[in-house]
Amino acid sequence: MSQQPFLPFAKPTIDEATIAAVGDVLRSGWITSGPKVQAFEAQLSEYFGGRLVRTFNSGTCTMEIALRIAGIGAGDEVITTPISWVATANVIIETGATPVFADIDPITRNIDLAQVEAAITPRTKAIIPVYLSGLPVDMDRLYALAKKHNLRVVEDAAQALGSTWNGQRIGSFGDFVSFSFQANKNITSSEGGCLVLNNAEEARLAEKIPLARRYPQRLRWP
């Protein structure tokens, strides 16, 4: 029995212009949270129809921040899919909540929304759908279900930058939408991620949570 090589990920496209742009940043001496980051957030905001965008060190970080903004914590349950990277469940555990796995649709391999509804209990506070290989779930059904049961939705769209639902870009609607810029994603900054948010207060909280961890003696949450 011959051994086949593992299915390869796409090699990121890094051209000379990209290399030169990185060099410009390194020579500027401002290599983190500088004007290039602000410009990137502005471009993303325009792409998502003017929604608020905040960038962070990873897509994992953005999902945890979204859960904390949504008030998820100890004693709560968050429904998600078992077909995902471990970070999707880990961020739920990190908040003190319990991940509850709903089965997948055998055709799309995405979370089965009928199974999600069957898994809802009085402790359920949120749903994290994962858009496997960039394929979104039925967004109309997802948000109708969330509204029916008063649940928040944190979209794990790590692989879905550029995907659409009924002509609308993923990220241009919804509660919280998390994208990843890790090395094998649609676009990459080596590592990184962004959170697309609904309103200015949520954006303020998204900025404050990481600062509260870095400077706990100066800031309080929320």
Question: Which positions does each model-derived feature cover?
Answer:
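Radical SAM/AdoMet-radical enzyme domain recognition
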Residues: 145-150, 168-176
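Active-site region of PLP-dependent enzymes
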Residues: 160-166, 173-222
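PLP-dependent aminotransferase class I/II
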Residues: 37-43, 47-51, 114, 118, ...
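N-terminal "arm"/small-domain region of PLP-dependent enzymes with the aminotransferase-like
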Residues: 1-31, 35
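Structured loop/turn residues at beta-strand edges in well-structured enzyme cores
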Residues: 48, 73, 122, 171-172, ...
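PLP-dependent aminotransferase-like
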Residues: 68-157, 164
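Phosphate-binding glycine-rich loop
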Residues: 30-77, 91-95, 101-103, 168
